[in-house]
Amino acid sequence: MAIGRLRLKPRGYDFPPYRPPSESSSLLLRVTRGCPWNRCTFCSLYKSIPFERRPLEEIFEDIEAARALYRDETRSVFIGDSNSILIKTEDLVRILTVLHQAFPNIERITSYARAKTICKKPPEDLRRLREAGLTRLHVGLETGDAELLGSIHKGSTPEEMVTAGRKAKEAGFEYSLYVLLGIGGEERWEQHARGTAAVLNRIDPHFIRVRTFIPQPGSGLYDAIKAGTFKKASHETILKEQQMLIENLDVTSTYLSDHLSNYIPVNGKLPEDKHCMLDVLDEALTALHDDETLRERFSRKDSLRNL
């Protein structure tokens, strides 16, 4: 959807700067700006954006601007920025209602969310949001290892991650969890893999989406690598970590490597595709030792920034 052509108001359409790859065809609607937490040591995406809730009038103006161009073709909407479900439930219900009125063919509305926010939302509020048309929540798990969650300043415990996931599923949401390969570095990759699998098994989310940790300038872990206090995981370690993660999964989730940061595509429906997924990783680990071109390709991934 080429909504970049929107130029209907002097102030301009306010686009969310980031969205999941799976929302590449969605209309983007900015409800909040920035990240209300903004302390994770691996992330610098919102460091320069103060958190604020956008006025409802501005949001409704943006919906009207988009409706004028894309009323009938809009099938999905992504709500940004990083945790818009923390606004008042009645306000988000109003926004969802207006979206459905403006775009009669909407099939899906999704949003980023924090586990802590989901934990704090009363179950009846989550059900109201679901009934109003919010269908999927994208949530960063990153890791299920308690020590790592603390060291990266995620702001949630493994138990809170589990509580949030179960609560969201009980309210009827599709639940998409993000795992950050390599976040344990060379020192803690096994604990990361096992702990993450344990949390995922207790939630059984609809989607597990993996990304590979890439140090971002301006983040705490980038500085730690430069200072020599964090040893970045090698290509081989990250492949072995993903292998251990998948081996320990006992879920019915769709597993997706739908991000440019990942070294190789490992995708499938669990549990039926587990053996094929592990075979892909076995082949990559074998090739890594013998194929200079593959090693160079992996190294180019390491130079990516802000993905």
What do these predicted regions represent?
Residues 1-23, 201-203, 207-307:
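Auxiliary Fe-S-binding modules of radical SAM enzymes
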Residues 15-61:
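Canonical Radical SAM [4Fe-4S] cluster-binding loop centered on the CxxxCxxC motif
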Residues 28, 76-78, 108-110, 136-138, ...:
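Structural preference for beta-strand elements that scaffold enzyme active sites
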Residues 35, 43, 59, 79, ...:
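Conserved, mostly hydrophobic/aromatic
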Residues 59, 92, 122, 161, ...:
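Aromatic/hydrophobic pocket-lining residues that form the small-molecule binding cavity
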Residues 67-170:
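Conserved SAM/AdoMet-binding glycine-rich loop
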Residues 116, 140, 144-148, 168-192, ...:
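Conserved strand-turn element in the central/C-terminal portion of the radical SAM core barrel
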Residues 122-126, 184-202:
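Catalytic cores of alpha/beta
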